[in-house]
């Protein structure tokens, strides 16, 4: 809605990989541009300035995680039936929770876009190993 209707929402991405900031932001921009083009929509002028990418939740980069991330995965699956994996979605969900706490966000709606990772969730559960855990 932010880009479609010039809303007041914020678009915040959380990098979970070891990619450099510029490369990661280009990936976000490309995805948004492709979506708008495929749907015959026009991006507002200066839309790129609306993207915010947080790099502080990478936990060492791709495939690296710790017990805090595993705990979030367990909690969300037990509470909400939401399968998260330690490589992608679990790390991103943990980062989102940290971001919300650190920025003291209250009384606002948050949309977490789960981008997949279900097979990795089952690998994590079945193996029950520390995998990439720090």
Regions found by a protein language model. Name each.
Residues 87-89, 113-116:
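Short, loop-centered acidic/histidine patches that primarily coordinate divalent metals
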Residues 1-51, 114-134:
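Glycine-rich phosphate/pyrophosphate-binding loop at beta-loop-alpha junctions
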Residues 109-111:
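Conserved beta-strand elements of the Class I
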């Amino acid at each position: 809605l932010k880009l479609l209707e010039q809303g007041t929402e914020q678009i915040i991405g959380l990098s979970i990989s070891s990619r450099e900031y510029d490369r990661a932001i280009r990936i976000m921009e490309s995805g948004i541009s492709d979506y708008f083009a495929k749907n015959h929509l026009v991006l507002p002028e200066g839309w790129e300035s609306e993207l915010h990418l947080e790099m502080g939740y990478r936990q060492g980069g791709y495939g690296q995680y710790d017990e805090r991330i595993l705990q979030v995965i367990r909690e969300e699956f037990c509470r909400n039936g939401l399968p998260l994996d330690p490589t992608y979605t679990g790390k991103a969900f943990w980062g989102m929770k940290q971001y919300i706490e650190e920025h003291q966000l209250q009384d606002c709606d948050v949309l977490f876009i789960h981008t997949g990772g279900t097979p990795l969730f089952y690998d994590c559960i079945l193996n029950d190993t520390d995998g990439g855990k720090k």
